[in-house]
Design a protein with these regions (language model features):
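Bacterial N-terminal signal peptides that target proteins for export
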Residues: 1-8
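Bacterial N-terminal signal peptides
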Residues: 9-17
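Electrostatic cytochrome c docking/interface patches
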Residues: 22-47, 123-125
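Gly/Gly-Pro-rich "capping" loops immediately C-terminal to redox-active cysteine motifs
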Residues: 32-43, 56-87, 93, 100
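The canonical Cys-X-X-Cys-His
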Residues: 42, 49-57, 94, 109-113
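A general structural signal for well-ordered secondary-structure junctions
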Residues: 51-52, 73, 91, 119
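Axial heme c-ligation environment in periplasmic c-type cytochrome domains
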Residues: 62-66, 87-125
Length: 125
């Protein structure tokens, strides 16, 4: 009985640790969230990194999805968008940009994409 209790305790402790890691991951904050200049830098990166080849001008979609569509973006946190740019998406044409772009540059791209989506939403598009 003591052995079973020890195993149960160790399992619960491990699960609690995993939850803490997941929470920390979910809590990443875009350091450029309130910096309007970062969106302009993000737009330049969008062009220079070749994002337009798949996502079209102004990120409105081509081969890849429309990254300004609020309905499409709704389920994604900024952290998820950041990680998708950083690590790519397996089974898709989305390549990882880790090693090509710095974390700072990826956050600037995230800022640009979210701002474009907000502008589009405000315009009723």
């Amino acid at each position: 009985m003591v052995k079973n209790t020890t195993i149960l305790f160790a399992t619960l402790l491990g699960l609690t640790s995993l939850r803490s890691i997941a929470t920390a991951e979910d809590d990443l904050v875009n350091p450029f969230d309130h910096d309007p200049a970062a969106a302009a830098t993000g737009k330049k990166l969008f062009i220079s990194a070749g994002c337009m080849a798949c996502h079209g001008g102004n990120a409105r979609g081509a081969v890849g999805p429309d990254l300004t569509d609020q309905e499409w973006l709704r389920p994604f946190s900024q952290t998820m968008v950041f990680r998708t740019i950083q690590n790519g998406r397996s089974g898709t044409l989305m390549s990882p940009f880790k090693g090509t772009l710095t974390d700072e540059q990826i956050w600037q791209l995230v800022k640009y994409l979210l701002d474009e989506g907000r502008k589009r939403n405000a315009a009723g598009e």
